[in-house]
Regions:
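C-terminal accessory/tail domains of diverse enzymes
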Residues: 1-145
């Protein structure tokens, strides 16, 4: 599992349970992203429960760790609609991911892309465009060759 660093998603779920100082600490530990984040904090990644709940937890470095948890309940559809409300784009982002990785579940591909975006300091949109462009370039090379 990845240590998934939330930036864009934290804007979607700007929860009162998640103080800004914690978000700052999450962002600061992006270079220790796998399998856990030990830079001031331990940030445990996405747990996809039986019903498709996405859960993010942050532990402080204490004997009785405080836990910050924000869940999007029930299903990937709930997660999808929250994300789309933020981007105001139907399901286009998820459709693009599904086209790029037709044989893989969104539960796995999306966190991986989000992690890459954080590590590289790019938006998810930019990461998707990079993947699409590189695939287009390799397809063009094959047809020419």
């Amino acid at each position: 599992l990845y240590c998934l660093i939330i930036d864009e998603l934290s804007k979607v779920w700007s929860s009162p349970n998640c103080p800004k100082s914690i978000l700052d600490r999450i962002k600061r530990c992006h270079h220790h992203y796998e399998p856990k984040c030990d830079h001031m904090t331990k940030f445990n990644t996405v747990h996809v429960h039986g019903q498709g709940t996405w859960e993010f937890r942050l532990w402080g470095n204490t004997k009785s760790p405080s836990e910050v948890k924000f869940c999007i309940d029930n299903s990937i559809d709930t997660f999808r609609s929250a994300y789309n409300r933020y981007y105001a784009r139907d399901n286009s982002m998820f459709d693009r991911i599904a086209k790029l990785y037709p044989n893989e579940k969104l539960e796995y591909t999306f966190p991986s892309i989000a992690r890459d975006a954080m590590v590289q300091g790019k938006s998810i949109e930019t990461i998707l465009a990079d993947i699409e462009n590189s695939r287009l370039a390799s397809t063009t090379r094959e047809s020419v060759g």
